[in-house]
């Protein structure tokens, strides 16, 4: 507990309301951050690559490792939502990306990050190839914004996956749905989801996501309380 507190204070600052947040300025991103090889396993009979679609993307979405032993990089929401990415990869399977596109995405993808923001909405999604079109095991899409009053067009999509939810008994349906309006601190894996360019400017501001989410903490009286267990 003491070590966690030291990391928290070192990477964060306090605003006028007494709420803690990361100190990274917009445009800044940690240098030399690790890109660990994803830990991937089958879940309820579904392999890491799912049952169709973009196998490489699905494998990243289905990773289950916990941020290289908890070493998450504190990055501000503004920095994350403004990260660059190639403009010509929308709905293009990763096997068909150019080398320059791969290099541009690899610069940030697969880094364990931690950021703060406000939950603008939560939705239990339908069936997807990532989860082998299971009706029982589906993602929760969460829209994260810099301010509680922001529209989803300014949000970053972050996702709860069935594989991670299976390891987090506190992530009940009611707990996840009740996050709307709360200030949260999210830890998870940075991922570029190229499959939804039509949502830009409508229900998201970027194709970058935190996917999967590994830890969720809620601000309660100026301190972060985990809802993982």
Segment roles from a protein language model:
Residues 13-15:
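Bacterial signal peptide processing site
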Residues 18-229:
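OB-fold and OB-like single-stranded nucleic-acid-recognition modules
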Residues 9-11:
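C-terminal motif of bacterial Sec signal peptides marking the signal peptidase cleavage site
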Residues 1-7:
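Sec-dependent N-terminal signal peptides
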């Amino acid at each position: 507990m003491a070590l966690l507190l030291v990391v928290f204070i070192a990477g964060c600052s306090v605003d006028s309301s007494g709420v803690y947040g990361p100190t990274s300025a917009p445009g800044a991103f940690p240098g030399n951050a690790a890109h660990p090889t994803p830990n991937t396993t089958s879940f309820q009979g579904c392999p890491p690559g799912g049952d169709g679609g973009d196998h490489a993307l699905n494998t990243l979405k289905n990773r289950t490792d916990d941020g290289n032993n908890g070493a998450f990089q504190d990055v501000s929401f503004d920095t994350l939502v403004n990260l660059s990415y190639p403009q010509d990869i929308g709905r293009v399977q990763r096997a068909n990306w150019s080398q320059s596109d791969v290099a541009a995405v690899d610069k940030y993808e697969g880094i364990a990050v931690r950021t703060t923001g406000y939950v603008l909405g939560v939705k239990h999604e339908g069936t997807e190839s990532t989860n082998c079109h299971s009706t029982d095991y589906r993602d929760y899409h969460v829209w994260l914004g810099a301010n509680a009053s922001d529209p989803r067009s300014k949000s970053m999509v972050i996702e709860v996956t069935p594989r991670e939810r299976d390891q987090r008994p506190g992530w009940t349906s009611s707990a996840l749905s009740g996050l709307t309006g709360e200030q949260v601190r999210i830890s998870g894996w940075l991922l570029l989801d190229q499959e939804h360019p039509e949502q830009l400017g409508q229900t998201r501001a970027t194709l970058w996501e935190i996917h999967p989410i590994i830890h969720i903490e809620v601000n309660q009286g100026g301190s972060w309380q985990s809802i993982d267990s």
